[in-house]
Amino acid sequence: MSGIFQYIKQTASAAKDYNILDFFPLRKSLAGYQRDFKGHLSGDTRAGVNVALLAFPQGMAYALIAGLPIEYGIYGSAVAAMVAPIFAKSHYITLGPTNATSVMLLSAFASLGIAGPQMLSLVPLLILMVGLFVVIGAYFKVANFVQYISRSVITGYITAAALLIIANQLPKALGLSLPRKGATFYDSLTLISSHIDTLHWTTVGISLATMALYILLNRCCKTLPNVAICLIAISASSALFLGPTANVALLSGINAADWSLQLPSLAWSDIQLLASPALAIALLCILEGISIGKSLAAKTGARLNANQAMISIGMANIG
């Protein structure tokens, strides 16, 4: 046992200089703009447009997965993209909502028996607590110990999350109007099978067309923003050829004027209620962000400062 503690101590000591946290690394990136303003601006603009075209529809999808209005996903992606780079040293960190965190957020509120307006009022506090936990973890160098978590644990959770996403989104793809009961994978499939005779075939056709177009584009045009292309092409085709008589369910509109900046409720009872889910989601954010970042960095031979990456992830949630 003493050998394990000695190894951990030596590893932490060797990484000490490398893992010094920088709370404003953006200044180094801005220094590059002074040397070649046009070149940096042109490249970053193209990259920003491409990422935005991908993040916009994905943000909406993640919001639906989490049981939230679609604007939550859009705003979350936008704020994360604006706040996190101020604290990030690496180009390999992915930010914003993800499949796994969206499922965990939905599951957390479902396990607490919270839904509707109460859920919407508590989401900002939950995300704030997640961000604080991640930043505190970065200060205590938690990322140094993430490597000891088994890859099979992460893979198993992500696989289970993917199955739950499929089960929860199938009713929308099939045009079924179901009561929101199925909290588990089995319950969701049972509920769908009991209403299979009420399929809305126009919605099924749109879903299949979207899947076919996405698979085709992924095979022949991998460099294009295929998610955005599918969203625009299928939506335009449906509006042009089907019209309102098709009775296809539509998303509600987004009114930007309704978005106001305000602090979340900081009631102690709410903080106690959300502490455990926030800690679990924070751990998942750390695992996802660092594992993806390390994989991307390894492809170019770069090295990821995992604790600095945690600062950017945490501040994105706080923002």
For the regions a protein language model found, what residue spans apply to each?
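Transmembrane helical cores of multi-pass ion-transport proteins
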Residues: S2-G319
